Amino acid sequence: MRGLIPDHMLERGRTVLDSYREPVERLLSERRMPEEGWPDDVIATFLWELSRMDTDKDPKAARIGEREARVASRLAEESVFGFCHGVGRSGTLVDPQPKAPGASIMYALTNRLVTDFLRRLGFRIEGAFVVPGATGLSIALCLSALGEGEEVIYPYAAHKSPIKAVRLAGFGMRVVDTEIEGDRIVVDPGDVEEALERSESPAAVLSTLTFFPPRSSDPLPEIAELCEEYGVPHVVNAAYGIQHEQYRDLLNRAIKRGRVDVVVSSTDKNLLTPVGGGIVYAPDEETLREVSRAYPGRASAAPVAHALISLLSLGMKGYRRLMRRQKECKALLDELLEDLEARRDDVRVLDVDNPIASAVAVEGHDPVDLAARLYVRRVTGPRGVRADDPFGTSRLRGYHSNYITINAAIGVREEDVKTAVERLERELEGE
């Protein structure tokens, strides 16, 4: 470029270019989550540069394989930033793919970043990787890799995804029923131990860290201790467990006290990505390697790219800011619901100890119908459960109240919370 414009102008232009290159060079060198988030155009340029390393971008290549990243539409290619070969090999999900050097770098870098991200949030782990499948599929992958017996011990939670995951992995299920303590639905560690003793061939314990109230988190430290004592793998469903310190602290106590093989969280619920990705993390890297070997075939790069985009866009500061806002919105939600309770005889805020969601008993109202009417009023997310519903209540013998749950998860806005409670009151009034 020298000689085309004056040198001082050229140097000025290089300064601008360097400002874009510098974060990329630092990322490739340090391989850590950036403190500050990146602009979208820098992220996009970085991803396209990586994807141009894949063999399907070689203009002189003779592509004669049955899988050559051919796409019918440019739109499809753009939707994955050119990573059309996907990630992984048929043997191991996290292994480099010879036809996709760029995608392999992208995947390895994403896993480095998500590990660093979790450690800096305070999780006691040795490694993590992104799975191109949401929470249920990721749980099934972990169970298929680690389970050696015939049935999974499952402290009961009203969620079809983990139940289907157990079946998909080829195991039977021994359900541990829950108990009521005040307003909370809890798991007795003694019942888990009894299930382990009665099972002739326990494959694993699938515990629950995060769930809708009034279902409480499982007693993870006690379950971890039992899994270590009985020599049974322990898989933790922490679907949205990354976004709050209460879940982190409970998980860390379990890791310190006993056996936790792997933890599964969702990328969309924690990293604000499109649905489709999971994060598997563990206190032992070899266990993660074993899980990655269980994945059948190559995988889509889209959920991995989505996770990387979110990590780079937010940075550590951006994510911590979202965590602070979530706490503020949850406090606002509780305040508004308590105010509603003080003004109405048909509403009681349940004591559930959940940092993400609140539960409200609604006397004289059908909670399922109430949640449906809120949906029509353009309030998405409330969950209505009847007291005699053995599935919805997460208790085979039912619950003492009809209730609805309202979430204030990461990414929620104050105006969302205010509008939801206002419309709830209108529906209670029958307006």
Curated annotation (Swiss-Prot):
Coiled coil: none annotated. Pathway: Aminoacyl-tRNA biosynthesis; selenocysteinyl-tRNA(Sec) biosynthesis; selenocysteinyl-tRNA(Sec) from L-seryl-tRNA(Sec) (archaeal/eukaryal route): step 2/2. Its cofactor is pyridoxal 5'-phosphate. Its EC number is 2.9.1.2. Pyridoxal 5'-phosphate binds at residue 67. It is an enzyme of class 2 (transferase). It catalyses: O-phospho-L-seryl-tRNA(Sec) + selenophosphate + H2O = L-selenocysteinyl-tRNA(Sec) + 2 phosphate. The keyword tRNA-binding applies. The record marks 66 as: May act as a substrate filter by repelling compounds with a negatively charged alpha-carboxylate. GO terms for biological process: conversion of seryl-tRNAsec to selenocys-tRNAsec; selenocysteine incorporation. Substrate binds at residues 89-90, 97, 298. Residues 88-98 are annotated as: Phosphate loop (P-loop). Homotetramer. This is O-phosphoseryl-tRNA(Sec) selenium transferase. It comes from Methanopyrus kandleri (strain AV19 / DSM 6324 / JCM 9639 / NBRC 100938). The lineage of its organism: Archaea, Methanobacteriati, Methanobacteriota, Methanomada group, Methanopyri.
